[in-house]
Amino acid sequence: MRVPVRWVLWDVKDTLLKVRRSVGEQYCREAQQAGLQLSPAQVETAFRLAYKQKSQLLPNYGRAQGMDSQVWWTGLVRDTFGQCGVHDPALLDKLANNLYHNFCGPENWEVFSDSNSTLKSCTALGLKQGVVSNFDRRLEGILRGCGLLTHFSFIVTSEDARVAKPDPAIFSQALERCGVPASSVVHVGDHYVKDYLTSRSLGIRGYLLNRKDGQKTHLDIPPEHILQSLDELPARLQHNTD
């Protein structure tokens, strides 16, 4: 007998919302206000390299090393602008502080057109909803500013959980909050390993959101586990399709 769905867990970035402009553009806008003229493409390249290096050296915002996300992001901003020839410590700290707080605001985020309607539909089906995200502690404020926070009963961020996807332990923490068997829980996210495979490894009903090319990229996934739009989810949940 199929266990009915009781909860829906959500990834956030690139699932429910996305960065409104590229990181290179946003960093350059902040630098311009400080009198610097930099190329967005150059800053974007520098950011990607710095992010990769720092994520390998100090994964999950350096939580295992006793850091918090603001310290981690400050270091990343310094490294990014340093590659672009900006080395003034006071200026770098100012840029880092401004950018950290700027990304708390809804003006830097764009909610996908199918997010709000799908969240409302899940609530109408009697489902409770939560968040499992490799994000830092700013996420609650971002969701509030974007008008999404009220849909969720809880938020588990990797910073607060001290563990990040694809470690299944972050999903285990979310399941404890749900208080129901994993088979009664759905998870929706856009990353094949971090969201789909990891949630499925615990018995959660994982769905992979693949807005760009649907089934083409992941031929090993049953078609009924792939969403090309969040609009497809409510009907699948209503019929309890696995």
Swiss-Prot record:
GO terms for cellular component: nucleus. Pfam families: Hydrolase. InterPro entries: HAD-like_hydrolase_domain, HAD-like_sf, HAD-SF_hydro_IA, HAD-SF_hydro_IA_REG-2-like, HAD-SF_hydro_IA_REG-2-like_cap, HAD_sf. PANTHER family: HALOACID DEHALOGENASE-LIKE HYDROLASE DOMAIN-CONTAINING PROTEIN 3, PTHR46191. Belongs to the HAD-like hydrolase superfamily. This is Haloacid dehalogenase-like hydrolase domain-containing protein 3.
